[in-house]
């Protein structure tokens, strides 16, 4: 079956996770919030049903890279954490507002500034 999930680093894995210490540090140092997300390799394949299933599992967002970064980092014995930003809101039912891109340049620059500040802070603790 072509659509069968391919597991290259683990025989069975449902969730990939950031390093706990880095996650605590980034939320503490930057005062940001921590939420679960879904990481998928299916570009533009979300359906209303999938969106609801993911939300029912506690996910507040969808991205395409985080799972791979966390899985490979763990496999290689490296520590990893992700800082993500909400850029849009997908509809969860046919009555929801139409999808619209909401990210601004100011939001992008702010995220980069926060990431640099975090990298400097953890580098100074070594």
Positions of PLM-derived features:
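Conserved active-site and cofactor/substrate-binding residues in soluble primary-metabolism enzymes
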Residues: 17, 21-24, 49, 64-68, ...
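A C-terminal functional module that forms or caps the active site or interfaces directly
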Residues: 49-89
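His/Asp/Glu-rich mid-to-C-terminal helical/loop segments that flank catalytic regions of hydrolases
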Residues: 90-126
